[in-house]
Amino acid sequence: MNPGETVLPPQLREEIALLAVYLLSSGRGLLEEPADYGIYRCTDGARRALQLLDEHGGSTARLTAVRERLDEVMFAPMGEDRDMGAILDDLCRQMADALPEIETP
């Protein structure tokens, strides 16, 4: 490790590794699952990443709002009629607006 670098807390390191496992296994599952599943797997991956930021103090109000909307989408009853394209377009715009607020070292 170089001077000035920080070590990730063990819990955060584990959670990031678990997110990577989720994304990899989701990619593998897409080879055999219906195509529509991909939308939800990618959406859930984004939700999980934003949840990590929330849990470890790295989020902003705008990012939390995106994660909360993703929670609503992911935990809604199956078969509910919704326009995922419009929802994801809106969330992408919200993410783009939120990115400048993120502090970088």
Curated annotation (Swiss-Prot):
What the entry lists under Pfam families is as follows: DUF6092 (PF19585)
Source organism superkingdom: Bacteria
Q: What is this protein called?
A: Protein AlbB
Organism field: Streptomyces noursei
Spell out the InterPro entries in the cross-references: DUF6092
Provide the function of this protein.
Involved in the biosynthesis of albonoursin (cyclo[(alpha,beta-dehydro-Phe)-(alpha,beta-dehydro-Leu)]), an antibacterial peptide. AlbB is essential for cyclic dipeptide oxidase AlbA (CDO) activity.
